């Protein structure tokens, strides 16, 4: 029943985690290593989450056996998730709402039913960015230019349509009275390619998570026009919210962890215990503060 509950939460929040009843788990689990699959490139959101897990589990000695992060790039996460599906209970993958929307949009045959949900871990906020040389200075200017020139206003998103970056901007557009079907989205493999496209004026703006944009913002390569949080964030107080700029949108981007479909109840209980210790540790809480992520933990039980 806990497993079903986590799945329900995933789906109800645009997410993925389960609904299962309390059962005793007496059988020992023989797991001698951990492989965390990040279904995108190093430095992207899923990868940052995977490496945060690796760092915390090792530093806190919660999992003392070898831990590796494997980057499997392609298919808007599909390549990494297909890889995970074929593995055993020692292989876990980072996920997000894209696992669900890939299937709904016809981009993948995979569904949440092909995996075992283990936990929701943390959440991030969405931002919209432009190049440092852009004449757009705030969110209202951005949306007005977009509204007047929809066919020629190009918006970058990675790694695919249907992810939270895409969906958050769709929500903003609807709130501003723009039909999202008329928007020109350009899909890139990763955020680095989006930044290059902004610099080279191939796109006018881009949507991504704050943790992905922050480094480029602090180095002066981009401007962040709005953040999807309910109020300004302490670590970047100069960035206004959509809401204070007259666009009533709040959008939270979640990150989760899952395993292959055929995990045993003992394996699920084992990882449940490990992950719970991880999110309660000082190291994990420090990473959340450092990256501006919000605690969003919900275990499989």
Sequence positions of predicted segments:
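Surface-exposed aromatic
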Residues: 154, 289-301
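C-terminal lobe and pocket-closing loops
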Residues: 212-282, 286, 291
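Solvent-exposed coil/turn segments that connect beta secondary-structure elements
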Residues: 97-99, 123, 133, 211-212, ...
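Hinge/capping helix and adjacent helix->loop/strand transition within the periplasmic-binding protein
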Residues: 30, 83-91, 104-193, 255-287
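Short, low-complexity disordered leader/linker segments with a strong preference
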Residues: 1-33
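Ligand-binding pocket segment of bilobal, Venus flytrap-like solute-binding proteins
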Residues: 157-239
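Short, polar/charged alpha-helical segment
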Residues: 46-64, 166-175, 216, 283, ...
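N-terminal (or domain-start) structured segment
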Residues: 21-114, 161, 178-204, 297-298
């Amino acid at each position: 029943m806990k497993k079903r509950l986590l799945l329900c939460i995933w789906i109800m929040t645009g997410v993925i985690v389960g609904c299962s009843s309390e059962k005793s788990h007496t059988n020992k689990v023989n797991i001698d290593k951990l492989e965390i699959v990040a279904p995108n490139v190093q430095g992207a959101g899923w990868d940052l989450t995977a490496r945060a897990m690796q760092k915390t589990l090792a530093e806190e000695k919660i999992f003392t056996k070898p831990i590796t992060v494997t980057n499997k790039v392609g298919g808007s996460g599909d390549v990494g998730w297909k890889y995970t599906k074929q593995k055993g209970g020692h292989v876990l993958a980072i996920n997000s709402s894209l696992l669900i929307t890939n299937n709904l949009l016809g981009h993948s045959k995979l569904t949440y039913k092909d995996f075992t949900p283990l936990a929701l871990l943390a959440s991030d906020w969405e931002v919209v960015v432009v190049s440092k040389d852009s004449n757009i200075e705030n969110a209202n200017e951005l949306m007005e230019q977009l509204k007047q020139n929809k066919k020629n206003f190009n918006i970058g998103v990675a790694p695919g349509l249907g992810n939270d970056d895409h969906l958050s901007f769709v929500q903003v557009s609807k709130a501003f009275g723009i039909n999202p079907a008329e928007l020109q989205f350009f899909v890139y493999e990763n955020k680095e390619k989006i930044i290059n496209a902004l610099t080279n004026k191939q796109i006018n703006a881009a949507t991504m998570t704050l943790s992905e944009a922050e480094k480029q913002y602090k180095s002066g390569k981009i401007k962040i026009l709005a953040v999807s949080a309910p109020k300004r964030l302490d670590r970047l107080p100069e960035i206004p919210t959509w809401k204070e700029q007259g666009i009533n949108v709040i959008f939270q981007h979640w990150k989760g962890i899952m395993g292959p479909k055929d995990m045993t109840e003992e394996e699920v209980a084992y990882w449940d215990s490990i992950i719970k210790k991880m999110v309660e540790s000082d190291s994990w809480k420090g990473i959340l503060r450092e990256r501006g992520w919000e605690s969003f933990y919900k275990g499989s039980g």
